[in-house]
């Protein structure tokens, strides 16, 4: 059974902007959603979506047929509280040459001020290559995983979701063979790191549950 679901809720960092058409999808917009962890660290997550996926009633846009999808997008402002459900996907960023992880939004709704934050990921895929087991400078044991999931855009194609497991899950997943089916639960996080003198950001699923028997 295929599974690729993410639900997030946080604060819009800046008003949505037009994005280039992706995998044949037209009328695509992009926004960055900020979600604050209990530790105070902010994860900034890229959301791509189409205007017709917005819940118009959550924006006070009534009757719904009086507003075009573009009208609805313009009602989402910097600082808006937003809920998004959809799938995790990747695309090649030709400006940087890197793969960009993003949420492909299937449903968006504006939330009341002060609403609770959300960051929950559930995926089932298969291990692409040999996992990498490592120890962080703070002494934590982590395993890096590359997990293949189906493309949301092209039947028969896949995309690669970078994931990490930690603690006992890191030990459990460290020696899984490529092709092994795996189920992961966790959250999507952004993480800064240094490459030489350059500060870069990467995105990954931080999995709190890992199972090869689901």
Where would I find each of the regions flagged by the language model?
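Single-stranded nucleic acid-binding surfaces, predominantly the OB-fold ssDNA-binding core
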Residues: 1-214
